[in-house]
UniProtKB/Swiss-Prot annotation:
This is Phospho-2-dehydro-3-deoxyheptonate aldolase 1, chloroplastic. GO terms for cellular component: chloroplast. It comes from Solanum tuberosum (Potato). The gene is SHKA. The keyword Acyltransferase does not apply. Belongs to the class-II DAHP synthase family.
Length: 538
């Protein structure tokens, strides 16, 4: 299971721990990444042969087992798409498709060597953990749980330290407690952490003062400094990204199971927030009710020492973008015989790479992890239905999460058509709102920012549409940090355009700071509570 109450902080058993501490150094390798021997299957990895879900007799039915053929696919456009020949899936069958957003490495031999090294590394996460997450997401699809997914726009090597990881984890815990009380349902906490490095770019090159260099694609590909050395894609960065991901998740496991996530501690943090918030009166009532509930539970014997009160479940996620790296961390699970991408529990395909006949969709259709699909107002309803058919032909609950990113007004117009199309097709999905990407603007100073009011408006539109359609709002997906940055304007502790430059630290897109994130969780909790009380009164 993931970072759960059933695991221990110092266990090194395969079904509980991440990786053992060992040197992770590249070695001389011979196997070619883009060789003609692309039909080689991933070997069984003996160290994870005993890794499975808590109930080893529960063999999940997931989208595609290895050696099964893909359904006919089409391009993700509104025009009729050409038929795609059925092919068997293999861990490297994506190479036969058009792959967008991949960097061009000048040193292919070094890339092959690094990928072979990573292929021999231990998995970062395990199959049983991903299956547990899929089960939880299946509950969210039915309206019986709520997904809270958040973290950095892009993780960086420079800002990698324990305090930053702790602060983001802490704010997710605080938000989760607020949402859980408001909705009276489990909250599935998934971090955009321990692997969210790579970023898609609208242009492969950037030009300044007549100098043209490759675009910055994330710290696992190249550096953000505008010089030839930094911008040249470096395969060794993949090794560092792996090590940082493993170390991050190792620390998260310790936080989740070592008492840091104790419910009483979390609620005290929330009470402190309401004391210092300009709109504290609005949120103090909810925080006080949580405090009263905890007092009742303690009186009933459910004290701080009980595992359920001092531990939590937590999963990791990132965009499936850098396919060579993802392939190198794909392992076959001995319990089910299915392939899992062991770089994260949950992966999503982005707006720029979700072509029905593209390499990213080809790779994702064959792995058994729960998957997300980023959807903008440009998504045609029929194309979405086809994409879901490809990725989840057996229609398994929890397998597919639709992450909508449209802006408030577009949400009210476009989302109903997507919901109706998916419902007509009988497909089971978890609907999630990403209120960040559709609300990016440029400030007068030239920096990108996102108005808190626009983010809040999109969340409200998301709930309004689901109320109107009789469907379930299954969660939120946020770019956020536990730091006191000034990247998004607005919020109760008002950040203005003039404030942006004071603590603008993002390596990519603007993030909600700790206060703004928690404020948004109180707003969502109020909406969940109204929805719950409304359903009870019917």
């Amino acid at each position: 299971m993931a970072l759960s109450s059933t695991s221990t902080t110092n266990s090194l058993l395969p079904n509980r721990s991440l990786v053992q501490n060992q040197p992770l150094l590249p070695s001389p390798l011979k196997n070619a990444f883009f060789s003609n021997n692309s039909t080689k299957t991933v070997r069984f990895v003996q160290p994870i042969s005993a890794v499975h879900s808590s109930d080893s007799n529960k063999i999940p039915i997931v989208s595609d087992k290895p050696s099964k053929s893909s359904p006919p696919a089409a391009t993700a456009t509104t025009a009729p798409a050409p038929a795609v020949t059925k092919t068997e899936w293999a861990v490297d069958s994506w190479k036969s498709k058009k792959a967008l957003q991949l960097p061009e490495y000048p040193n292919q031999e070094e890339l092959r060597s690094v990928l072979k090294t990573i292929d021999e590394f231990p998995p970062i996460v395990f199959a049983g953990e991903a299956r547990s997450l899929e089960e939880r997401l299946g509950e969210a699809a039915m309206g019986r749980a709520f997904l809270l997914q958040g973290g950095d726009c892009a993780e960086s090597f420079k800002e990698f330290n324990a305090n930053n990881i702790r602060d983001t984890f802490r704010i997710l815990l605080q938000m989760g407690a607020v949402l859980m009380f408001g909705g009276q349902m489990p909250v599935i906490k998934v971090g955009r952490m321990a692997g969210q490095f790579a970023k898609p770019r609208s242009d492969s090159f950037e030009e300044k003062d007549g100098v043209k260099l490759p675009s910055y694609r994330g710290d696992n590909v190249n550096g953000d400094a505008f010089d030839v050395k930094s911008r040249t894609p470096d395969p060794q960065r993949l090794i560092r990204a792996y090590c940082q991901s493993a170390a991050t998740l190792n620390l998260l496991r310790a936080f989740a199971t070592g008492g840091y996530a104790a419910m009483q501690r979390i609620n005290q943090w929330n009470l402190d927030f309401t004391e210092h918030s300009e709109q504290g009166d609005r949120y103090r009532e909810l925080a006080s009710r949580v405090d009263e509930a905890l007092g009742f539970m303690t009186a009933a014997g459910l004290t701080m020492d009980h595992p359920i009160m001092k531990t939590t479940e937590f999963w990791t996620s990132h965009e499936c973008l850098l396919l060579p790296y993802e392939q190198s961390l794909t392992r076959r699970d001995s319990t089910s015989g299915l392939y899992y991408d062991c770089s994260a529990h949950f992966l999503w395909v982005g707006e720029r790479t979700r072509q029905l006949d593209g390499a990213h969709v080809e790779f994702l259709r064959g792995i058994a992890n729960p998957l997300g699909i980023k959807v903008s107002d440009k998504m045609d309803p029929s194309a979405l239905v086809k994409l879901i058919e490809i990725l989840n032909p057996q229609n398994k609950a929890g397998r597919i999460t639709i992450i909508t990113r449209m802006g408030a007004e577009n949400m009210r117009v476009k989302l109903p058509h997507l919901i109706r199309a998916v419902r007509r097709a009988g497909q089971i999905v978890t609907w999630v709102s990403d209120p960040m990407h559709g609300n990016t603007i440029k400030a007068p100073c030239g920096l990108k920012t996102r108005p808190f009011d626009s983010i809040r408006a999109e969340v409200r539109a998301f709930f309004d549409v689901h109320d109107q359609e009789g469907s379930h709002p299954g969660g939120v997906h946020l770019e956020m940090t536990g730091q006191n940055v000034t990247e998004c304007i607005g919020g109760s502790r008002t950040v203005t355009f003039d404030d942006l430059s004071s603590r603008y630290h993002t390596h990519c897109d603007p993030r909600l700071n700790a206060s703004q994130s928690l404020e948004l969780s109180f707003i969502i909790a109020e909406r969940l509570r109204k929805r719950r009380l409304g359903s009870q009164s019917v």
